[in-house]
């Protein structure tokens, strides 16, 4: 990742994800379907963000290793380029995922369509 505030945001999401894991393990949550559904949705969203952030870290490590290998063997240049492109894509994805979303996006909606 590139920005410290992104690192902080992902760290907070990891913490919240751990809290949700504990909350979702409680049997009494099953008796409250709305709260259960909301918790699972938040868990899925946070898990996705954390997974993308983890992949960015892996790609940074792999890219550094590939660059070192390229110094010894130029045939790794293609791998460096591939990793740079994937890292750029993942960073854009992460930036998009970290952008504030509309809280109403996760609410169910009833749409009535009338002809006439």
Regions found by a protein language model. Give the residues of each.
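Short, hydrophobic beta-strand segments
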Residues: 109-115
């Amino acid at each position: 990742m590139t920005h410290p505030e992104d690192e902080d945001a992902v760290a907070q999401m990891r913490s919240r994800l751990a809290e949700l894991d504990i909350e979702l393990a409680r049997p009494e949550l099953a008796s409250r379907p709305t709260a259960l559904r909301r918790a699972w949705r938040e868990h899925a969203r946070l898990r996705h963000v954390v997974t993308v952030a983890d992949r960015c870290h892996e790609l940074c490590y792999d890219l550094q290793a590939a660059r070192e290998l390229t110094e010894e063997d130029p045939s790794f240049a293609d791998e460096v380029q591939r990793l740079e492109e994937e890292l750029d894509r993942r960073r854009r994805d992460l930036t998009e995922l970290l952008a504030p979303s509309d809280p109403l996006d996760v609410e169910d909606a009833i749409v009535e369509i009338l002809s006439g």
